[in-house]
Regions:
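Outer-membrane beta-barrel proteins and related beta-barrel translocases across Gram-negative bacteria
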Residues: 1-325
Length: 325
């Protein structure tokens, strides 16, 4: 009931049956629709907001069954915890001007996911760590906006992401078998990445009266918003992080180096490779006309709305560092 619990929601849709029941249910033999229903899906979801704590929690569970081969895909739970933007250094009782560190804001999003694909008669025989795909991810962006020389808005941002895995897969090439082989280590594995950016923008205003309409009360307002941003991140395929490795694949006399991540294919993707050092330039234009109508009321009409152009330069790129305009 939304009125009884305005900060929480619950929903459920259940359509579940074991494959053995489907095969032995006499009623289904005479029900062509039931017999032709190859997939059954069930879902349950719950969410709750805590406005005073700037916190929200949502959780769901999903089951998808394929009756023909008795396979089942289960995700339980898939839970997200979100902390909306807070200013941890802001004083409760401010005196005087706002301090620079009071502008720093923090957000948090955490997600836990646990899933498996198996046969329905084997579901409860599976090991939680070895057979289920599970993990947790934390995302923490920290940012602030400052005014520089009265006219420039400066926004530094730092993004931090951390993943928790329960397995690490080392790969190699087996010459005798002629295929890739895996060596899996189970336990707690922590993987993180980070990036930083700095954005600067300002606004330039222009007002003028059209030369061809001097007798009418018409004004044109032109707003130009130039911006420049810098973003950087290290190469997380580097050996100093320990997230990636490589092996030599020797097949049909052709030797190739294969790079891979120990944590590829899991519920949360590992950090991407490649060093980043991007400088971006952008100009946005807005043009509007203000005039008096027949009733002497002032009206505004947008002539150009957010006409933008931009270009970027990747300082870490060896080939084609400039983007298209």
């Amino acid at each position: 009931d939304p009125k009884a619990s305005p900060n929480s929601t619950f929903s459920a849709s259940v359509n579940f049956a074991t494959s053995s029941y489907e095969r032995t249910n006499i009623g289904n033999m005479y029900n062509s629709q039931a017999m032709s229903q190859n997939t059954k899906t069930s879902s349950v979801s719950y969410s709750r907001n805590f406005p005073d704590q700037h916190l929200s929690i949502s959780a769901s569970g999903n089951i998808a069954q394929t009756m023909r081969d008795s396979s089942i895909a289960v995700t339980l739970p898939d839970m997200t915890i979100s902390l909306s933007t807070i200013f941890p250094f802001k004083r409760k009782h401010a005196v005087g001007d706002e301090k620079w560190y009071e502008k720093i804001s923090v957000r948090y999003t955490g997600r836990v996911k646990n899933s498996i694909k198996t046969k329905d008669n084997l579901l409860f025989k599976k090991n939680l760590i070895r057979d289920w795909e599970n993990g947790m991810q934390h995302e923490i962006p920290v940012s602030a906006t400052f005014t520089l020389f009265k006219y420039f808005n400066v926004t530094p941002t730092v993004n931090y992401t951390e993943r928790w895995y329960t397995r690490k897969v080392k790969k190699d090439w087996d010459d005798e078998q002629g295929k890739e082989v895996n060596d899996t280590t189970y336990g707690f594995h922590r993987v993180y990445d980070y990036s930083a950016s700095l954005g600067i923008n300002t606004k330039v205003y222009g007002m003028y009266k059209p030369l061809f309409m001097k007798k009418k009360e018409i004004q044109i307002r032109h707003v130009i918003t130039p911006s420049i941003s810098f973003s950087a991140a290290p190469d997380f395929t580097s050996s100093r992080f320990g997230y990636y490795d490589s092996y030599i694949k020797d097949q049909n006399g052709i030797r190739d180096t294969v790079q891979y991540s120990y944590y590829a294919g899991q519920v949360f993707s590992p950090p991407s490779g490649g060093k980043q050092g991007l400088i971006s330039f952008n100009i946005s234009n807005n043009l509007e006309m203000k005039f008096k109508d027949k009733n002497d009321s002032i009206r505004k009409v947008s002539l150009i709305d957010d006409l933008s152009m931009g270009i970027s330069y990747n300082t870490a790129a060896q080939v084609r560092p400039w983007s298209d305009l």
